[in-house]
Regions:
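Interaction-mediating elements
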Residues: 1-124
Length: 124
């Protein structure tokens, strides 16, 4: 169920690097949240050079957002965010002041996958 959306300026990372990022996101998410790897989905979106802004100024900014089921502990979320930050910055070279990560939790009853309403965390 977790859906990761990586938003980054076009040309910053190669298709090969996107594949590495997707594998690392999957590895991190499954090791921290204890879910099967086929639950993890990753999508890359790019924007044209000159179309990113930070503080109202043009910038090469990036974001990694994850929609996931609620029910994970604060410790799990903190651990995952820290690992994701380190990995994403290492593989993209994005400056610390240009990267934003977020987790957006939703009730499992608000998500479907494989034609089924998702179960609560811990009931996979």
């Amino acid at each position: 169920m977790p859906l990761y959306t990586a938003i980054i300026q076009e040309g910053i990372v190669s298709v090969e690097t996107e594949a590495k990022i997707a594998k690392e996101i999957t590895r991190i998410h499954t090791s921290v949240m204890k879910v099967p790897k086929n639950f993890v989905r990753v999508v890359f979106l790019s924007y044209p050079k000159g179309s990113g802004f930070t503080g109202g100024e043009k910038a090469t900014t990036a974001a990694l957002n994850c929609v996931l089921r609620s029910g994970h502990t604060a410790e799990e979320k903190t651990d995952m965010l820290q690992q994701l930050w380190t990995m994403f910055q290492r593989l993209t070279g994005i400056a610390t002041d240009q990267l934003a990560l977020s987790l957006q939790e939703i009730p499992s009853s608000n998500a479907m996958e494989m034609g089924q309403i998702m179960q609560a965390v811990g009931h996979e």
